[in-house]
């Protein structure tokens, strides 16, 4: 399986994402600069965290216009797995690939610590290796991670089982404790916590690795078993 890590000016979690795929998952991965127009050779697309374009205007508001995002949109329409973490989640929301918005944390402070998440839906291509309601420890590092949506959108997310992760103890004011959501099709996941920073027991825990293992399992079942 071949992954692409999209790198924007100001990305700073791309190396962590690359390490998670190459060294922990053992799969092929490339850094792909934001001006690329073709992602057809890749099986999965990863949008890392950071401060793309300095977070000017709004987090992710400029990155949404990058050439690569047109290719990401195409990949999403093709059903390829798209994972956006932290700033990557913000870019997915700004691009319209996921509903809602990410606003300033309720306490107006940047927060960097490990939090507990509850797996709300383990039937997605990103969460199949978890148990439903499993509690996992994943780091956060954000100042604008407060997920917001209106009541109608929240109702739709709940009815369609699009909420992938919730905070056990809400750190930022996110509506309904939401930490991560998928699109209606189920192939685009955005989450504020950083699973790529929790892939090695020697570095504090590996409870985020199952996100990437789930993607790999889905791909193998679809393209290898049926080959």
Swiss-Prot record:
GO BP: any one term: 'de novo' IMP biosynthetic process
Pfam families (UniProt xref): GATase_5
Keyword Ligase annotated: yes
EC number(s) given by UniProt: 6.3.5.3, 3.5.1.2
Gene Ontology terms: cellular component: cytoplasm
Major location (coarse): cytoplasm
Catalytic residues (positions): 86, 194, 196
Catalytic reaction(s) noted: N(2)-formyl-N(1)-(5-phospho-beta-D-ribosyl)glycinamide + L-glutamine + ATP + H2O = 2-formamido-N(1)-(5-O-phospho-beta-D-ribosyl)acetamidine + L-glutamate + ADP + phosphate + H(+); L-glutamine + H2O = L-glutamate + NH4(+)
Domain of life of the organism encoding this protein: Bacteria
Subcellular compartments: Cytoplasm
NCBIfam families: FGAM_synth_I, PRK03619.1
Subunit structure: Part of the FGAM synthase complex composed of 1 PurL, 1 PurQ and 2 PurS subunits.
Protein name: Phosphoribosylformylglycinamidine synthase subunit PurQ
Lineage: Bacteria, Bacillati, Bacillota, Bacilli, Bacillales
